[in-house]
């Protein structure tokens, strides 16, 4: 908007809000007396979205409806419609129970903790994180593989509550309404059918230790963390109203479910699909408590997780959406990196499909998308800072398959020929 002293740039326009020139941004929108760039418009949209989210949480006595929760989950998590419905209803009922437990004393509503079962990279952790963000409650994550029974080397179960307290800035009241997500819960399954063979301090022992805090107890938490020791003051945290969400890939559970299905489907009319003919996520939909018991979870622990949400394998269409649709989508992140070099990065639609298929072949789900893109763009990102005149880099399906190099388009339109074609 303002003019610069040099004759070369006296007609350069600037954003009235951030001060960037028209050459530093994609778009500069003119008003009667001001200019605003596309980046500032995006920032304004983010602020409005955050305001809308906070107003959503404050509506209806602080409890968004299941449909409202599910709608916000759709903005962050691609696919998994069934799991979103299960989670939305469970979380809505949980916080409705908290808000009304002092109003009606005739019927006591029990807490419903949640178990998420799904393949690697299907969105279990992201769902739990997004729920906490929607509800504006303290949230912490714990890795079940690091937990051991009290008195053994490893992390005490009560340290989970300490982390939640830290997330709540040591506000005990807020922490007591928070959400705890315990990942890799399948890794603490019982290591043997006979629990008396050895002392299983990281398997069944951890399940036993988790029982109390999941059901509801007053945990004595050391304020500075670590092991308890005498002459130490403890913080008392009631875990009765803390929502526990446990997640795991449960590798091998599909075989247990399929075996149970085969035993009940016999006769000439029975249609039995081989395990390889069905996707893991589809098989998980038929999970029963008895399957979890056979997997190695103890009956008391399964009883503390009455709500089970199963996630399906992400198909090619879902993985393509994950690459491009979310606000912090991977493709947008790499495009931003290239923009810093004043170069446009373009992915052909067939290239995105090829990336998605690679992730499916590797069975890494959404988690494996970044490593695939990193390997595709490695040579380009290595060479790019030293290349002169490159205006655009195009990634085709052949580049993803490894049969061609990225197409470099130069600013001089008479020489659009690329450094590309064929290699292998």
UniProtKB/Swiss-Prot annotation:
InterPro entries registered for this protein in UniProt: AAA+_ATPase (IPR003593), ATP-dep_Clp_protease_ClpX (IPR050052), ATPase_AAA_core (IPR003959), Clp_ATPase_C (IPR019489), Clp_protease_ATP-bd_su_ClpX (IPR004487), ClpX_bact (IPR046425), P-loop_NTPase (IPR027417), Znf_CppX_C4 (IPR010603)
Molecular function per GO: ATP binding; ATP hydrolysis activity; ATP-dependent protein folding chaperone; protein dimerization activity; unfolded protein binding; zinc ion binding
UniProt-annotated binding residues for ATP: 119-126
Keywords carried by this UniProt record: ATP-binding, Chaperone, Metal-binding, Nucleotide-binding, Zinc
Residues of the ClpX-type ZB domain: 3-56
Any single Gene Ontology cellular-component annotation: HslUV protease complex
Pfam families (alphabetical): AAA_2 (PF07724), ClpB_D2-small (PF10431), zf-C4_ClpX (PF06689)
Binding positions for Zn(2+) per the UniProt entry: 15, 18, 37, 40
GO biological process: cell division; proteolysis involved in protein catabolic process
HAMAP family: ClpX
Function: ATP-dependent specificity component of the Clp protease. It directs the protease to specific substrates. Can perform chaperone functions in the absence of ClpP.
Assembly notes: Component of the ClpX-ClpP complex. Forms a hexameric ring that, in the presence of ATP, binds to fourteen ClpP subunits assembled into a disk-like structure with a central cavity, resembling the structure of eukaryotic proteasomes.
PANTHER family: ATP-DEPENDENT CLP PROTEASE ATP-BINDING SUBUNIT CLPX-LIKE, MITOCHONDRIAL, ATP-DEPENDENT CLP PROTEASE ATP-BINDING SUBUNIT CLPX-LIKE, MITOCHONDRIAL-RELATED
Protein name in the entry: ATP-dependent Clp protease ATP-binding subunit ClpX
Source lineage: Bacteria, Pseudomonadati, Pseudomonadota, Alphaproteobacteria, Hyphomicrobiales
